[in-house]
Amino acid sequence: LNEDDCIVVPVRNEITPHFRRVGNPSFGKRLGRAEDNPTHDNCVNYLYDELNNKNIEAVKFSTYVFAENRTYEEQVIFSPLKDSDFGWYKEKDARIAFHEDSYIQPDIGGRDRNKFFPRSAYPNIIIEVIRTHYPERDTFQKLLELSKTNHHVYFYFIDEGNKKSKLNSLSIKNGILTLRVSHYLIGGQLYKNGNCYAPKGEDESFEHWYQYLENSYFTNAMERA
């Protein structure tokens, strides 16, 4: 492998022996900046280790759904089917490349090892831990695109020094790991506690919509966490 993660093979040539690259570089330009924060990194490692815990028999993603009187019940958003074999990856091993030579690097990614491509019942999972900043415009645009192709995107907001908050948490009971979230993206639609949140207007530009989400959806969640 060379520095671009490409396979190189020797070419026998009596005059100028050399190596030939097979294929193109795996990744181009990264979209978005990484969180340079110990709390963020510790939380990513914590979630990753628990998801890969061999004692875990099942994984569930859930959310609190609130009634008008603020009582709530916990509802499951997604749980892999029994015939699934989910593998979990983080950071460099969770990269997703796009055709215009760019890529994003989710904190954690998961997929069913038995499927070549994600399906509605077997989606790919993206978990973004948010401590110091939320996804930038270009990154969010890619996450939105992916959510339309059987990817679930879960936003996990935390405060400094913590691995959970009032918005989300991880719990394990009887071999079942439950990751509770409040904010997530599925099927091109943002959700907050089970309810659709501010769908993009028919004539609204993506930039205007994202700016609104910056000042409401993401900022409010970071403040609450």
Q: Where in the sequence are the language-model features?
A:
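Nuclease-adjacent, charged terminal/linker segments that flank catalytic cores
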Residues: 1-78, 82
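A short, polar/proline- and glycine-enriched secondary-structure boundary/capping micro-motif
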Residues: 32, 138, 166-167
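Generic surface-pattern signal
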Residues: 48, 52, 56, 148, ...
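Active-site metal-binding core of divalent-cation-utilizing nuclease and nuclease-like domains
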Residues: 58-123
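Basic, amphipathic alpha-helical patches used to engage nucleic acids or provide basic targeting signals
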Residues: 119-163
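Non-catalytic C-terminal interaction segments of nucleic acid-processing enzymes
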Residues: 133, 151-225
